[in-house]
Swiss-Prot record:
The modification Phosphothreonine is found at residue 134. It comes from the Eukaryota. The modification N6-acetyllysine is found at residues 123, 126, 132, 161, 167, 230, 239-240, 261, 305, 427, 434, 498, 506, 531, 539, 541. It comes from Rattus norvegicus (Rat). The modification Phosphoserine is found at residues 53, 65, 76, 106, 166, 184. GO terms for cellular component: cell surface; membrane; membrane raft; mitochondrial inner membrane; mitochondrion; plasma membrane; proton-transporting ATP synthase complex. This is ATP synthase F(1) complex subunit alpha, mitochondrial. Acetylated on lysine residues. BLOC1S1 is required for acetylation. Keywords: Acetylation, ATP synthesis, ATP-binding, Cell membrane, CF(1), Glycoprotein, Hydrogen ion transport, Ion transport, Magnesium, Membrane, Metal-binding, Methylation, Mitochondrion, Mitochondrion inner membrane, Nucleotide-binding, Phosphoprotein, Transit peptide, Transport. Glycans are attached at residue 76.
Amino acid sequence: MLSVRIAAAVARALPRRAGLVSKNALGSSFVGTRNLHASNTRLQKTGTAEMSSILEERILGADTSVDLEETGRVLSIGDGIARVHGLRNVQAEEMVEFSSGLKGMSLNLEPDNVGVVVFGNDKLIKEGDIVKRTGAIVDVPVGDELLGRVVDALGNAIDGKGPVGSKIRRRVGLKAPGIIPRISVREPMQTGIKAVDSLVPIGRGQRELIIGDRQTGKTSIAIDTIINQKRFNDGTDEKKKLYCIYVAIGQKRSTVAQLVKRLTDADAMKYTIVVSATASDAAPLQYLAPYSGCSMGEYFRDNGKHALIIYDDLSKQAVAYRQMSLLLRRPPGREAYPGDVFYLHSRLLERAAKMNDSFGGGSLTALPVIETQAGDVSAYIPTNVISITDGQIFLETELFYKGIRPAINVGLSVSRVGSAAQTRAMKQVAGTMKLELAQYREVAAFAQFGSDLDAATQQLLSRGVRLTELLKQGQYSPMAIEEQVAVIYAGVRGYLDKLEPSKITKFESAFLSHVVSQHQSLLGNIRSDGKISEQSDAKLKEIVTNFLAGFEP
C-alpha cells in the first residue's frame, strides 16, 4: 500500500495554480485540472491503483543523466597569456576553448588559476569570457593524406587546397621510444651532397645537427637532402623510400613560399609535408610546430616506413618558449631561458629513432638546425643541442665567402654513428680524405708565414687544395652516391694532382657527363654491389686515365 500513500501525498502537494501543472506530468486524467479541489475529485474517480501505476511508470522512465561541462572565466588576458579561474580538473597541455572560438593550451596549473597560452590573437578575448575544457590533449592529423600539403602547427591546411582528409589523429607530446624497441643505425640516409656523404655520413634514425651563422647555407643542405630523395621515392621499393617533413619555425612567409615553390619545381612536394609556424604566428604555435611535425613523422616510423624531419630552426623555438615561460612567470635561468629548455629539445630529438624488426623496422631521422651568433658554438642553446644529437655539420661564414660551398668546416664537423651506415664504396674512396683535409687546414695556416716547405708538406697542401675544390657543389643539384664515388676516386687516388685547381670544377662536370653516358654499367655495378670490386677499381682507373689524357679544359 506504500504506492497508494505516495500517490495521495503527491496529489496533496500539487500546486494550487493551474498554470504550473504540466499536461503530461501525471497522465491524461489531470489535463483539465484547475485547482486543488478539482484534482482531488478526479483522483478519487480515477482510483488510487491507476494513479500509482502512472507515477511509478513516470519515475522509472525519467532520464537522470546530466550533461556537465567544466567551465572557467578569464581573470586577465595579455601578451598571448590568459589567466583562467574555475578549471579545477584541467590537465597539463589540455586544449581549452574560449567563447570567441579561439583555442588555447593549459600550461601552468596553479592552486587558484590556470595559465593558458592562446593559439592566435588575444584581442578577441576579454576579461570575464567563459573558457571551457575540451577534454583532449593537443593532437594533430597524421597519415599519407598530408603528403604534398602545407599545414600550420595544429595540422590545419594553409595552402588553399581544402581541408586535410586524414581521419587519424596523434598527440603532439608523445613519449620517445624506449631502449628495447630501438636498434643501432645501420642504413645510409643519402643527402646527395659530396661533402656530407663522404665526410659526415648520416644514417636512418640518426640526429645530425646543422649549425652555423645566418646566411651560411644551412637550409640549402636540408632542401638538397629532400630533393635527393626523389630518386628513391620514384621507385617501387617501399624500404628505400624516405618521406620528408620540413618544419619552418619563425621564418618569413615569403621564405616558406619560395621553399615550397622550389620543392614543387623539383617534384619533391609529393613526398613532403611542410609544417609552418611563421614569424607572424603566436609564440605558442612556434613552440608547438616541431612537436606537431614529429608526430606526423612518427606515423611513418611506427608503420615500418622511413621518414626524415628537418627543424628549421630550433633557436627560434627556444626563443618562443622563453617568451611564453617568462610571461607565465616561470623562473628564468641562464640567458633568461627557463630551467627546462634542455628538456624542451631532448624530448623532441629523442623521438628520432631506428626501430628493430619486431617493431616494424621503420626509422625517423632528424636534421635540427641551430643558428649561431658570430660563430659562437659555446652559447647555451648550441651546446645543449650538440650534446643531444649524434654529430654536427658546422658551417662557417669565412668559408662561405671564400666560395667554398657547402661551407663545411671539416675539423669541427663530425658524425658519431653515421660511419656504420656509410656504404662500403664510399668508405673505400673517402676513408683517408677527412684526415687529409684536416691536416691541410692545419698546415695551410702555417704555410702563409713562409715558403720554405719540404716536399711532403707541399704535397699535402697541393692535394688539400684540389680535394677542397672537388667537394664544392652547386645548390639544388644533389648527386647519386655512385657518381660521388667516381668523382672522389679521381681526387683521392692522386689523378688530379697535376691538374690546375681552377679547372677541377670543369673536369668534374665533363667527367661525370662522360661516365653517365658511356659507362652506365659501371655505375650500376657500384650501386648494386655497394662496394668497388677489383674489376670496378681497374675499370675506374682506366676511365679516369683515358679521360684525363684527352681532357682539354
